[in-house]
UniProtKB/Swiss-Prot annotation:
This is Transcriptional repressor NrdR. It holds the Pfam family ATP-cone. Belongs to the NrdR family. GO terms for biological process: negative regulation of DNA-templated transcription. Its cofactor is Zn(2+). InterPro entries: ATP-cone_dom, NrdR-like_N, RNR_NrdR-like. The keyword ATP-binding applies. It comes from Bacillus mycoides (strain KBAB4). HAMAP family: NrdR. Negatively regulates transcription of bacterial ribonucleotide reductase nrd genes and operons by binding to NrdR-boxes. Keywords: ATP-binding, DNA-binding, Metal-binding, Nucleotide-binding, Repressor, Transcription, Transcription regulation, Zinc, Zinc-finger.
């Protein structure tokens, strides 16, 4: 590793720690030439995950979009931001574990709804009503009946 102060190539690692839930390593280094200390981070480079939208357009996966949708669905509900961030991470992990480079937006929506159903039923219905574009009250009622039936099981 090259020293950012004197550009010497010889450095030694003083300390290494896992960070970001083990997805990165933080290393404290010291230059062998000028004794300057600096920090580096090492992480696995992930290939981009492409989302195929309903109309056929493609864009890079953005977990912030999922988080924004979850926050909106959970407004005035007893759900913490931490829980929503965990859902977002879980969704991304599940998508990456599929081992494919392109994923349909429908699949993402279904995974998000399954995760949200376990956290808060009201937030689930809010998210589902937007995601599935409920056209009338009957569709809404059918979704509620489905939730109640699954709770009884």
């Amino acid at each position: 590793m090259r020293c950012p102060s004197c550009f010497h190539n010889g450095t030694r690692v003083l300390d290494s720690r896992p960070v970001d839930e083990g997805r990165s390593i933080r290393r404290r280094r010291e230059c062998e030439s000028c004794l300057s200390r600096f920090t580096t981070f090492e992480r696995v480079e992930e290939s981009p995950l492409i989302v195929v939208k309903k109309e056929g357009t493609r864009e890079e996966f953005n977990k912030e979009k999922i988080l924004r949708g979850l926050i909106k669905a959970c407004e005035k509900r007893p759900v913490s931001l931490r829980q929503l961030e965990e859902v977002t991470q879980s969704v991304e992990r599940e998508l990456r574990n599929l081992g494919i480079s392109e994923v349909k937006s429908d699949m993402i929506g279904e995974i998000v709804m399954e995760e949200l159903r376990d956290i808060d039923d009201v937030a689930y219905v809010r998210f589902a009503s937007v995601y599935r574009q409920f056209k009338d009250l009957n569709v809404f009622i059918e979704e509620l009946k489905d939730i109640l039936q699954k709770e009884r099981e």
